[in-house]
Amino acid sequence: MADSSADGGAAPRDVDSGLFARLAADPLATHLGITLEQVRPGYARAAMTVSPSLLNTVGTAHGGATMALLDVVHAAVSNSHGTVAVAQDVHTEFCAPGRPGDVLTAEGTEVHRTNRTAVYRIEARAQDDRLVATALARVFRTDRPWADA
C-alpha cells in the first residue's frame, strides 16, 4: 500500500489510540471474543478463537460468527481514516470450515476509496493459513469525524 504522507513515504502509522479504543470496544465483538489487533489507514486485523459457543450443529465454526469477524474488520478498516463510514454491502464467501480451537485471523485492506464510497477486501484465515472466508465490502463515507460520533 502506498503512503502519500509528507514524511518521505514511511509506512503508515496506526490510527490514534482514542479511535482504536472505540473500535475495539464493539459490544458484539467483545461478546464473541473477537480481539481487534491493529488498525491503520486502509488496513485492519482482528482475531477470534473458535470456542465451543461459536460452533454450529455439525461442530464447525458458525457462519454467523465467522461473518461477524469479517464485519468487525470491515468496520475498523473502513473507519480507519477518521470519519464515520457505514456499510452498504458485504458479500461473503465461505471457503473452508473453521474448526474447534482454530484461531481465525481476519485482515482487511482498502481496494478503492473516493470521497463518498470505499471498497474493502477482507480474508479470514486459520493458524495453518487455511482460507476460511473472504468478503468484498462497500461503505458509504460520511463527513462526520469520529471525534463527533
Label each region the model flagged:
Residues 2-14, 98-103, 109-149:
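HotDog/MaoC-like acyl-thioester-processing domains
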Residues 1-47, 51:
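Non-catalytic linker/capping segments at the edges of enzyme domains
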Residues 24, 28, 47-75:
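Hot-dog-fold acyl-thioester-processing enzymes
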Residues 75-105, 110:
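Hydrophobic beta-strand-centered segment that forms part of the acyl-chain substrate-binding groove
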Residues 48-50, 94, 141:
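Hydrophobic residues in beta-strands and at strand termini
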Residues 30-32, 42-44, 84-90, 102-104, ...:
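A generic structural signal for short beta-strands and their flanking turns/coil linkers
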Residues 59, 82-83, 129:
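Detector for glycine-centered tight turns/loop "hinges" at secondary-structure junctions
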